[in-house]
Amino acid sequence: MDKRLGIIGITIKDRYKSAPKVNRTLSEHGDIIVGRMGLPFRDKGVNVIGLIIEATTDEVGALTGQLGMLQGVKVKSLLV
């Protein structure tokens, strides 16, 4: 399979409960992550992480699937 460029958006509701699990999962898939930016939206009670990735569709599915199973975490991806 060919690798494709993509973006993954992650929102985290409970930072203290979910962030360690999110960071662990991202570290496990670090070989596909080209760039990462995280922003806290304290007034909204949400934290946002944006990832630039280069991966196969299977690799993207594995990462987003693991993240999506975490409580309080929502994930969306876009491949180009």
Residue ranges and their predicted role:
Residues 1-80:
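Long, contiguous binding/interaction regions
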